[in-house]
Amino acid sequence: MNKRLLRSLLSLMVCMAMLLSLTPAVLAESADAPSTEMAVGAVIHGFEVVENGEFALLNAKTTVLRHQKTGATVFFLINEDTNRAFDISFVTPLSDDKGIPHVFEHSTLDGSKKYPSASLFFNLIYQTYNTYMNAATYQVMTTYPVASLSEAQLRKYADFYLDSCFNPMIYEDESLFRSEAWRYSLESADSPLTISGTVYSEMQGAASLETSASYNAMKAAFPGSHMGYNQGGEPTEIPSMTWQEVKDYHTAYYHPSNSLTTVYGAIDDPAAFLALLDEAFSPYEAKAFDFSTPDYTPVTSPVEKVCQYPVYEGTETENAAVTYITFICENATEEEQNVLDLLTMLLSDSSSALVSNLVDVLPNADISVYLETDGPEPAVVFVATGMNEGDVQTLRECIYASVLEFAENGVSQDILDAIASSLTMETALMSEESDLGVNMAQNIAYCWATTGDVHAYEKTIANMDNFEKYQTEGKYAEVAKKYLTEDNQRVITVTTVPAPGQQEAIEADLAAKLAETKAAMSAEEIDQLVADTAAL
């Protein structure tokens, strides 16, 4: 998984067990064990119980079930949290920057066969007892979480989500695609032609040098793989998307065999949820999914490149670049990846030698480090902001020297204690949040999407207990020397710099193309587009 994405919540969970003992009513000491009907081997509404267990940090009893017909996985986490949550997630890989999974995520909740109303989703959000209702597209998955203080309401919302995911209205209604993705707009016959669309506009607003730098770095580190594509969609690419592509994408990936359903909280009648799921899944046959990356071409020698990000003339460019230095950790074992994950947290700590040394040589720069495991190979990624293009060699030398210093001296007990204290404080703040079930469901789904293991998130949390163990055993120094020194030739350095004046050029080019498109329209086409624009 992308550890930078999940780290904040993972860190919050380290001291969860201690906090749960302080949390009244909502999370009591322990949930009742699943009923005998959830015994391993039992079949309930077409689902076979595969295993029962515990998620100690949530005081939850867990049950994993497999749908006999499709192989779909369902994960129950039953405790006494009355803010119950339901989530269904799908692995949705990327092959371009059009943002197809993002558009489908939006259109999914625009109505379905059973619930044919484009406005129903927004009405449901404001219902009594509902505490959360949304959908989100990530680099590797699309997820549909909902939460409620009423179990009966949660089942109704689950039914709405299931029908929306599997029987969306977008198959029959192209206007939903035009509304959510992109469309030509014309206010009047004399107005300039423009492009509109919910996702198109959203991604224009979301564009930034920092996010572009991340995509640039991952494309260079993992060429030919799904890494580095913008899951939300690049505004320059979204208008090349077609309605048929969105429908084909749904057909390819929105299948029970490619799903994980998580049900969390004080669930009195799990069988009722299984009945809903069986009804939604049964029209499908089991299907095998292959998410390998046959076009991936591994980098075998050092790579360095500079990418430009368009900004307006006059934009401040001093200390505005972002540099990614990615170390491919070839054939790193699962244990080595666990060590690297915690090592990156130690290197990122404000008291670390890396941070201290960087202040001395590049006082305007900030650095963070994370373990990337979403790609075809694990990698440790150093991200420096507040950079200039000419600072790259200084940054690289600082990283190498600091890693060697760390390998020689290890980490002080003071830093270990400081990290533990910080995690305790963050966990205390988390206890005040209301969406624990939703957050847990999404993180479980994300880890499952990248590993195929429904317990991967639990294992990542458990690894947090190994901070001092790895130090005592010399594991940090071992992996640091093996993967993060100049001996590793598989290092990719990508700096993204602002390019003043390019944004004006892009906008002028788009305006010229739109003017050309309008000039080619007939009078009847223009009148129809004006009417369509008014209707939308």
Where do the language-model regions lie?
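N- or domain-start disorder-to-order transition segments that initiate the globular core
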Residues: 36-81
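Sec-dependent signal peptide cleavage junction
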Residues: 19-33
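Bacterial N-terminal signal peptides
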Residues: 11-21
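Helicase-associated low-complexity regulatory tails and linkers flanking the ATPase motor
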Residues: 3, 60-63, 292-294
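Charge-rich, well-structured scaffold segments of protease-associated domains
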Residues: 34-42, 107, 111-298, 319-323, ...
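Active/ligand-binding-proximal structured segments within catalytic/core domains
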Residues: 78-120, 124, 334-347
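Bacterial N-terminal signal peptides that target proteins for export
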Residues: 1-13
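Short acidic-hydrophobic surface loop/beta-edge motif
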Residues: 61-69, 303-314
